[in-house]
């Protein structure tokens, strides 16, 4: 019986996601056993600086990918939105389980909705994507950076001078906390989700055919297709955490991919947004990127990167 070593970050959410996925594999009843190896990433250690200032995408995966390449672990369970657009040579996303709710969750101290928040209220987020879109809707709000795991951020909302914070609905759902804490879900038209938000990425070595065969049982074709379009868009624009960038794709009734893509200025005064429909994930992602580039997306990205230095 083969033992599969599964790499995971140490946070409660990461371990919850990892154990959930292992349970899906165990339910297949195939002759494998599983062991979780906890790995500390750079993103877990640097908590006093905003993500965008310490290198953005890859912060939560590099050390785990190193463990995959050195064969310390066989596979890793990541949040798809933490994945860089390009993976190291020899590694691949071997499986994308069915995506859960991709929306952002708005959590306010007083129970006020986003529209009802008092003028000048303090909004906690560590995401340039969220802050740009929410400032575009409510320029009067003040954004204050907030870092840490879900539980840390919820504690900071209670104890510190934040009026509201924004978290991913998916993480709260996986922890079973969504009904308890969420004031409202932000509609995708108000705040376009991050590329891959709500989805998991199961990363493994390309040459591990045995494991890839096992993972195929849990793969969700719709999630794979829609997330692929989002990631092609991200790759073409070379967008990481340093840039207000968003991309969310769904499948229409006749199986076409509909991708809404967005790039914004840091302060939300400029939001470029395009929706592209097509059947090929790569073509849809590239088309969305090209349309935004024609509108000046590259200049916005350049300005955002300069602003982070």
From Swiss-Prot:
Keywords attached to this entry: Porphyrin biosynthesis, Transferase
Keyword Transferase: yes
Transferase is among the record's keywords: yes
A Pfam family that the UniProt record links to this protein: Porphobil_deam
UniProt cofactor(s): dipyrromethane
Enzyme Commission number(s) from the entry: 2.5.1.61
Gene Ontology terms: cellular component: cytoplasm
Pathway: Porphyrin-containing compound metabolism; protoporphyrin-IX biosynthesis; coproporphyrinogen-III from 5-aminolevulinate: step 2/4
Classification via InterPro entries: HemC (IPR000860), Porphobilin_deaminase_cofac_BS (IPR022419), Porphobilin_deaminase_N (IPR022417), Porphobilinogen_deaminase_C (IPR022418), Porphobilinogen_deaminase_C_sf (IPR036803)
Enzymatic reactions: 4 porphobilinogen + H2O = hydroxymethylbilane + 4 NH4(+)
Tree of life domain: Bacteria
GO MF entries: hydroxymethylbilane synthase activity
Modified residues (S-(dipyrrolylmethanemethyl)cysteine): 241
Co-factor binding details: Binds 1 dipyrromethane group covalently.
A biological process from GO: protoporphyrinogen IX biosynthetic process
Quaternary structure and interacting proteins, as annotated: Monomer.
Stated family: Belongs to the HMBS family.
Protein function: Tetrapolymerization of the monopyrrole PBG into the hydroxymethylbilane pre-uroporphyrinogen in several discrete steps.
Leftover remarks: The porphobilinogen subunits are added to the dipyrromethane group.
Name the UniProt record assigns to this protein: Porphobilinogen deaminase
Species annotation: Bacillus thuringiensis (strain Al Hakam)
Gene expressing this chain: hemC
